[in-house]
Amino acid sequence: MIKRLLLQHSLRLLRGCDLTEIYLGGGLIKNPVGGHDSVYRAEVVGKTGVKAKIVAYSVSKSGQRIVTFELEYPRTIHSEVRTHCMLDMNASSSRAIPMKFMRDHVLENTAFPVVLTKNQSGMQGRELHDGWIDLNVIADVYKHKVKTVVNFLKGSGAEFDEEGLRISFNNYIKYWVLSAVTADHEVLERSGLHKQVVNRLLEPYQYIKTIVTGTEFDNFFNLRFQEDADPTIIELANLMAYLYYNTEPEELSWKEWHTPYVLHERDVSGKLHYFVRNEAGEKEYLSGGRDGDAVKVSCCACAQVSYRKLDTSPEKVQRVYDLLINGGIIHGSAFSHVACPMCSMSASIVDGESVNMPVLPKTWQDGITHMDRQGNLWSSKFKGWIQYRKLIPNENCVSFDYEKRKQEVYSTVVGSQLTQLGGG
């Protein structure tokens, strides 16, 4: 049903979205971008630089799909993307990005809205704005003379209509607004403030990169690929849906793993092998299985979404892994993107034993968390797939000691500045 609605709406909405670049578009996308050894199966680029890439796309023998996207979109719509609780996500953090790099990145890759509409009541504009900003309005708001505004824009190198005394929305943001915001950003940096405070100033103009994995995308497409949604998230959902319905998933069997950023190949016997490329471009094969290096490398790669360059070297992987799992508090979200098919979606016999009998939870595979009213077995948010996170002991804290933690936090430099509750 959702696929049919997407196809019905696609021509109308594409006029507003205007896809600018599609890799391997037209028909099923069977080959990865950049060849069979690329970490990306397919990629599509839309207006204003919104991007969707498929990192891994798998289907079980029973036909249940799981897909991992790498997305880039304006941070302004991130809260709306995050409302979809059936999808697991990791996102780049302003707290992890050096300030100078953030400033340069925002100036070079400013995040703009996909569509500009005129103001009216309600959440959605229905009439297109021409995108021109009146220099007289700028002068009036800032209490400048128009000549002062004109001279500033000339000095900044901005293109604008001097005769008509107007400037495009994008150039206004880039040359007027960001000239002030980035200057303030640098002032705060040079004053010694931490990037977790300073970088927040630039978030409205920043692209965010996210890793999104799920087995259930119908509701996301249904809510976000329709005309009442924010135009920028319509664009994002459109790109994702295009790839989802036009890319051929890789079939995986029980005990074979969906591993974003870790590549697969089968030998003549049909056995699946896992590998990554080192800096020299050579294949480095990784052990498979639940406790293998392929799973570990994939999880750590997903955790590197804030990094400028993916690093799957053993040294980097070990450092990231230790930060995620060996620091006393488990940061489990990066382990949510790796999964393997359930041995069966219903009761079956495996190695002479009854497995996954719906009414007998003790027969369920490790990692299965619940059954829905239709009798489908789930592992957290994944239907028909075992999420690796659910195989990690203590991945979810169920015995938080507030009084103990309160003492630990209050004794730190930052904690000493918080509201001290309960007598310390």
Predicted regions and their residues:
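A conserved ligand/cofactor-binding region detector
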Residues: 1-424
